[in-house]
Amino acid sequence: MVLEYADLECPYCARAHLILKELPVRRVFRHFPVTSKHPRARVLAAAAEAAALQGRFWEMHDSLLEDQAHLDQPHLWERAERLGLDIDRFERDRRSPEVEERVAHDFRTGIRAGVVTTPTQFFEGEPHPGVPGPDLIARFTS
């Protein structure tokens, strides 16, 4: 199992995602929006959590990381529609205190775990910051 802390607007997180999604390992995702560098990171995290409430977290997660050129509001709605989400519910949920708290909770747990950059993967309790390299990939799959 790999626990990953990532920012959905971070280009390094997008690179890590492309590697991790191909590996035969269970992934647990935690939001770590670095808003000082990525101003839409918290909005995108809320969108992913709103999609999760309709059972489509990973689809929204993948869509955001795999097309970072289109992370503005109109494209969020387009993604939500393409995923078959109830748009009214999606909008309500992504602005809800519960979703905001979920994202904030993930961020706080990352801080407590020592996350200082994105992406950071935890494997066997050890933090591994940055895009996974060949040695770490080999450990993930052994």
Model-identified regions with their sequence ranges:
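C-terminal cap of thioredoxin/glutaredoxin-like
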Residues: E4-A6, Y12, H17-E22, E78-S142
